Amino acid sequence: MEHSAAVVVATLILGIFVVKWFAAPKEHPSAQRLPNTQLPSSSNNQQRTAGSSNGRGSQRRVSSTSRRNITPEMIETVRNVIPALHPEQIRYDLESTGSVEQTMERYFNGESFPFPPGYTPARESSANGQHNNIDEPSDIRKRSNIRPDNLLSKFNVDMSVDMSDMSIKELEIDERKKLLVWEARKNMEKRLETDTELASLIK
């Protein structure tokens, strides 16, 4: 009797497990792995977001570091040698070159010096209400009658003296001006050999 009772109990327990197994919902193995496979996508989105924010940050750093520190002394130095240029023209060019020497060399090489975007220079009016600059030549060198010979005499520059071995950082302000004019004249002489349009401006 005891053996029969044990067999009956074992059969009932086995039947319960079989019923639960058939009653449980079956999921495809790929469906069980789906939540795990979605995690890398979320991680990639976070990485892309972080990367784009880092990119914007680096762009801001580049734009901020590209701004040059232009001092009033730099503008005044250029203006003392080239009084025809407006301070805003000088400032705008210095923001590109960052160098007094390069700005002055650009001028003597006949480069254009535009005003900053959005800036309108004030025009002086004469007594009859007309602008003084009407019918004036557009080239700033012609308006101010600035010629290489004028600068040579103004700064007492002797072109027969070789100044190529001088360092501008070791010179006083007056000697720096002489060196800049000397270098600009030498560069202009080289360019005049091939640039007929520029040569016509200083005739």
Curated annotation (Swiss-Prot):
Q: Which GO terms describe its biological process?
A: ERAD pathway; establishment of protein localization to endoplasmic reticulum membrane
Which parts of the chain does the record assign to the membrane side Cytoplasmic?
Answer: 26-203
GO cellular-component terms in the record? Answer: CUE1-UBC7 ubiquitin-conjugating enzyme complex; Doa10p ubiquitin ligase complex; Hrd1p ubiquitin ligase ERAD-L complex
Q: Has the keyword Acetylation been applied to this entry?
A: no
Membrane topology of this protein: Single-pass membrane protein
Q: Which GO terms describe its molecular function?
A: ubiquitin binding; ubiquitin-protein transferase activator activity
- The record places domain CUE at 70-112
Composition-biased stretches (Polar residues): 33-69, 123-132
* Sorted UniProt keywords: Endoplasmic reticulum, Membrane, Transmembrane, Transmembrane helix, Ubl conjugation pathway
Matching entries from InterPro entries are given as: CUE (IPR003892), Cue1_U7BR (IPR041158)
Name its cellular compartments.
Endoplasmic reticulum membrane
Task: Extract the ranges annotated as region (Disordered).
Answer: 29-74, 123-144
Q: Does the keyword Translocase apply?
A: no
The portions of this protein that span the membrane are 5-25
Q: Which Pfam families does this UniProt record tie to the protein?
A: CUE (PF02845), Cue1_U7BR (PF18499)
Lumenal compartment ranges equal 1-4
Q: How does it assemble?
A: Forms a heterodimer with UBC7.
Give the protein's function: Component of the endoplasmic reticulum-associated protein degradation (ERAD) pathway. Recruits the soluble ubiquitin-conjugating enzyme UBC7 to the cytoplasmic face of the endoplasmic reticulum membrane where it functions in degradation of misfolded or regulated proteins localized in the endoplasmic reticulum (ER) lumen or membrane via the ubiquitin-proteasome system.
Q: What is this protein called?
A: Coupling of ubiquitin conjugation to ER degradation protein 1
Q: Which organism is it from?
A: Candida glabrata (strain ATCC 2001 / BCRC 20586 / JCM 3761 / NBRC 0622 / NRRL Y-65 / CBS 138) (Yeast)
